[in-house]
UniProtKB/Swiss-Prot annotation:
Pathway: Isoprenoid biosynthesis; isopentenyl diphosphate biosynthesis via DXP pathway; isopentenyl diphosphate from 1-deoxy-D-xylulose 5-phosphate: step 2/6; Isoprenoid biosynthesis; isopentenyl diphosphate biosynthesis via DXP pathway; isopentenyl diphosphate from 1-deoxy-D-xylulose 5-phosphate: step 4/6
UniProt keyword annotations, A-Z: Isoprene biosynthesis, Lyase, Metal-binding, Multifunctional enzyme, Nucleotidyltransferase, Transferase
Functional summary from the UniProt entry: Bifunctional enzyme that catalyzes the formation of 4-diphosphocytidyl-2-C-methyl-D-erythritol from CTP and 2-C-methyl-D-erythritol 4-phosphate (MEP) (IspD), and catalyzes the conversion of 4-diphosphocytidyl-2-C-methyl-D-erythritol 2-phosphate (CDP-ME2P) to 2-C-methyl-D-erythritol 2,4-cyclodiphosphate (ME-CPP) with a corresponding release of cytidine 5-monophosphate (CMP) (IspF).
Annotated residues for binding of 4-CDP-2-C-methyl-D-erythritol 2-phosphate: 241-243, 267-268, 289-291, 365-368, 372, 375
Family the UniProt entry places it in: In the N-terminal section; belongs to the IspD/TarI cytidylyltransferase family. IspD subfamily.
Protein name: Bifunctional enzyme IspD/IspF
Required cofactor(s): a divalent metal cation
Binding site for a divalent metal cation: 241, 243, 275
Site (Transition state stabilizer): 19, 26, 267, 366
InterPro entries: IspD, IspD/F, IspD/TarI, ISPD_synthase_CS, MECDP_synthase, MECDP_synthase_CS, MECDP_synthase_sf, Nucleotide-diphossugar_trans
SUPFAM superfamilies: IpsF-like, Nucleotide-diphospho-sugar transferases
Gene Ontology annotations of biological process type: isopentenyl diphosphate biosynthetic process, methylerythritol 4-phosphate pathway; terpenoid biosynthetic process
């Protein structure tokens, strides 16, 4: 159930990531086909309890950032500082004009935060107003002196590995950062340490072993292999839809209102592009078709906007732990002309689905004046969707459609 707390998230992405090797800042490198920052931001942008996502960037990275997160919802990026601490402070100040109750501070180099982890972070602020996710230390830790000689073996039962997102009451962590800035303290490696410095009691909550920070080239190799193994079930589905023209002054195509001298005869808004995409995604899941989930006999779908149907299909993929790898739609019509609107349609599909625009294709063709599309009696559309799901041997059994 959604929380009543107004929660915002800061995604700290201003670092250069030199230890990760060549290839530019690590947050813009790809892992299993998607950028690290897109993976890091997605869980927060899609979370129902997070009303605002505030990125903090190196201003030189803005073009890379915009390309990586096309279609996501987020506030205008804030410029980062010389240290992580300064960058977080910049993000907090950017949120101050519309101050949330709770702020989650997350490193862009941790691309595997889950909705459940985010929910635990929000709930943990009820304890002391400051909380950090932790996981147990499983290795024996040695404390050494300047020469490298062991001088202590800490009790690992009392040690924890700290992660992000770290969660705070917004007012107290903003005040803590302002105090540190006034006192010239810029040496805190995480926000929990800064909170401790001002006297806050920092609670802990259950982290996630998979929510590891990508730091070295070996980290990228390891996580690439892990994701490939997790999403090894590659599915392809196809969709097809047709609507005849009727009275009206526009048609909806791929979520875009297109002026036209006719409208569609349809139960919903008649968006043939989105309807075909819904069928393609459901087909990849072996999960029925659009009519089985949204029957035209049901009056609640009368005049409904088709973006609802597409979001539903995308959520079905997410519920299976999957990712959409590619979406393609081809419209067959004489008019309206699709070419001038192609990129607008791609951007709209990206906005609805959260899929990167680089993974979305919109095409158009004619039937050379043959058939009903050639006579301009309507529009036909085909679509395909490629979906990656976690491999599950039990899926080899024929269990029928899920409805």
């Amino acid at each position: 159930m959604p929380t009543s707390k107004r929660t915002a998230a800061i995604i700290v992405a201003a670092g250069r990531g030199l230890r990760a090797g060549t290839g530019g800042p690590k947050q813009y490198r790809t892992i299993a086909g998607r950028t690290v920052i897109a993976r890091a931001m997605e869980a927060f942008c899609d979370h129902p309890d997070v009303f605002a996502v505030q990125p903090v960037l190196n201003p030189d990275d803005l073009a890379m950032f915009n390309q990586a997160v096309a279609g996501f919802r987020y506030r205008p990026p804030a410029n980062g500082g010389a240290t992580r601490q300064a960058s977080v402070h910049a993000g907090l100040e950017a949120l101050a004009a519309d101050a949330p109750d709770i702020v989650l501070i997350h490193d862009a180099a941790r691309p595997f935060a889950t909705p459940a982890l985010i929910r635990r972070a929000i709930e943990a602020t009820d304890i002391t107003g400051a909380a950090v996710p932790v996981i147990p230390v499983t290795d024996t830790i040695k404390q050494v002196d300047a020469s490298g000689a062991v001088n202590a073996t800490p009790d690992r039962a009392k040690l924890r590995i700290a992660q992000t997102p770290q969660a705070f009451r917004f007012d107290v962590i903003l005040d803590a950062h302002r105090r540190a800035a006034r006192d010239g303290r810029d040496d805190f490696t995480d926000d929990a340490a800064l909170a401790e410095w001002v006297g806050l009691t920092v609670a802990t909550f259950e982290g996630d072993a998979a929510n590891m920070k990508l730091t070295t080239p070996e980290d990228f190799v390891r996580e690439e292999a892990r994701l490939a193994a997790m999403l090894g079930d590659i599915r392809t589905g196809t969709g097809y839809d047709v609507h005849a023209f009727g009275d009206g002054d526009h048609v909806m195509l791929c979520g875009v209102k297109v002026p036209h001298n006719r409208g569609f005869l349809a139960h919903s808004d008649g968006d043939v592009g989105l309807h075909a995409l819904v069928d393609a995604i459901l087909g990849a899941l072996a999960d029925g078709d659009i009519g089985s989930h949204f029957p035209p006999s049901d009056p609640q779908w009368k005049g409904a906007a088709s973006d609802k149907f597409l979001k539903y299909a995308v959520d079905r993929v997410a519920a299976r732990g999957g990712r959409i790898a590619n979406l393609e739609v081809t419209m067959i019509c004489e008019r309206p002309k699709i070419g001038p609107l192609r990129d607008t349609m791609r951007a709209r599909i990206a906005e609805i689905t959260g899929v990167a625009i680089s993974r979305i294709a919109v095409k158009a063709t004619t039937s050379e004046r043959l058939g009903f599309t050639g006579r301009e009696e309507g529009i036909a559309t085909t679509a395909s969707a490629t979906v990656r799901l976690p491999w599950n041997d039990s899926d080899q059994e024929d269990k029928g459609w899920s409805t």
